[in-house]
Amino acid sequence: MARGPKKHLKRVAAPKHWMLDKLTGVFAPRPSTGPHKLRECLPLIIFLRNRLKYALTGDEVKKICMQRFIKIDGKVRTDITYPAGFMDVISIEKTGEHFRLVYDTKGRFAVHRITAEEAKYKLCKVRKIFVATKGIPHLVTHDARTIRYPDPLIKVNDTVQINLETGKITDFIKFDTGNLCMVTGGANLGRIGVITNREKHPGSFDVVHVKDANGNSFATRLSNIFVIGKGNKPWISLPRGKGIRLTIAEERDKRLAAKQSSG
């Protein structure tokens, strides 16, 4: 009987969106416990080594982190397996680069560069609202932040904009039809569209219908919806493709057109 925490992760069992090949080794970096779930995060080592190619080995990543160059959400992180996740801002002071972790339409974390201005805030989905001791209202976000005394108009499933320096809420977007959202789970992971309607199913999962910029409609669970803008104006810059998933035929046509124009 195994007691205590698991400390290893086999490469074959690692999440597919990390895009690790099966044959390079036996193990994958097991993310530390932190604000994002193991299967929904991207360990810092994979971001620096496999995505940005700033290091060749895990030891090199360790050396970069231990020099305190890497900040996540404005805090220095020296743990190479720190679980960065959706909407986190990764800043590298030395190179003056800032990244926001958002999904591309294939459901992977895109390397999405942002300006220093945009790196000052992040969006968080409200998971839970409760009243604690002495009647103080608390709000819990998707990245495990607990914020006291939130605006009483903020409800569960809304999105709050958080200033990373102070950790305070600066603004919020209601979960409402007509607002722009990104899908953060399920088969439509990474797609962006406008909420058209919400079906309530008491005792089961509420279903939300979304329509993307090309007019394609799809439905997903309420728990997978993350509001990112009022109307159709996003509050963050979007990765390439703007969250519109092409069909296989459309992708092929796009590739051929690009090939002809270059050839």
UniProtKB/Swiss-Prot annotation:
InterPro entries: KOW (IPR005824), Rib_uL2_dom2 (IPR014722), Ribosomal_eS4 (IPR000876), Ribosomal_eS4_C (IPR032277), Ribosomal_eS4_central_region (IPR013845), Ribosomal_eS4_central_sf (IPR038237), Ribosomal_eS4_KOW (IPR041982), Ribosomal_eS4_N (IPR013843). Transmembrane segments: none annotated. This is Small ribosomal subunit protein eS4, Y isoform 1. It comes from the Eukaryota. Belongs to the eukaryotic ribosomal protein eS4 family. Keywords: Ribonucleoprotein, Ribosomal protein, RNA-binding, rRNA-binding. The keyword rRNA-binding applies. GO terms for cellular component: cytosolic small ribosomal subunit. Pfam families: 40S_S4_C, KOW, Ribosomal_S4e, RS4NT. GO terms for molecular function: RNA binding; rRNA binding; structural constituent of ribosome. GO terms for biological process: translation. Residues 42-104 form the S4 RNA-binding domain.
